[in-house]
Amino acid sequence: MYINNKIYHMSLLACMLSVLLISIFLPYTQNSAPRPQKADSVYSFISPQEEEQTTILIDAGHGGYDGGSTSWDERVNEKDVTLQIALKTGALLEDLGYRIVYSRTDDNVSWPQDNAADLQARVDLGVEEEADYFISFHLNATDFYNDGARGFETYVTPGNDTAKIASAIHEQLAQLDYSIDRGINEADYSSLHVLALNPVPAMLLELGFITDDADLAKLCDESFQEEMASAIAAGIQETVEQ
C-alpha cells in the first residue's frame, strides 16, 4: 500500500512538472515559429487603369458618298489615300500594343449622307469606345493645282497633350524629307467638327496637298505610305504610353 501511494505521488509530481515546463517554454516556441508571409500581391497591386490599353481612334477622313478633295486629273480621291495610310498606321500601332478603333476600314460607311451627321458619328464612336485619343487623317488642297502650296500640317485641340504628340509626329515626318513642314495649329472651331465638338483629345493630320504633283506622287506611293505610317506610329509611341 505504501509503495502504491509513493508511486502515485511520484506520478502526480511528474505530471505537475510537465505542466510547469510546458507553461514556461510554450510562449518561446510560439514566438520563434516562422510567421506566415503576406502574399506578394498585396505589395504589387496593379490598378485596373494601369492594366488597360491606351485606345486610339483612327479616323480615315471622308469615305463613301464623300470623296474629299481630288487630284487635278480626278483619278485620285482623298478618301482612298487617307484610308490606305490610316490602316497602315493603325496596324503598326496595334503591333506596338495600343488598342485601335477605326471609324472605317473600307469605303462603306454607316452614317447618313449628311456632312454634319457624318462627322458627329465619328466623334460619337470615339466616345462610345472610350478612346483616349482621336486622330483624323486628311489631305490638303487648294483651288488651283500646283500653285506652290505643299507640305504637311496638324491641327490640335488646346488644353491637352495633342500638341506634344503632333510635334513628335512632325519630327518623324520631317526625317522623310518628302515635303515642307507647315507647322502645328490650334483648331479653327468654326470648321473642324471632329476637333471642335469632340470631348476626346483630338488632332487632324493634313499629310500633304493632293493638288501638288510632288506631294501627290509620294502620298500615292504604297512603299512611301508604309514609311509615313511608320513615322506617325513612331511619333505616337514616343509620347503616348500603351
Where are these regions (language model features)?
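Catalytic-site microenvironment of enzymes
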Residues: 1-242
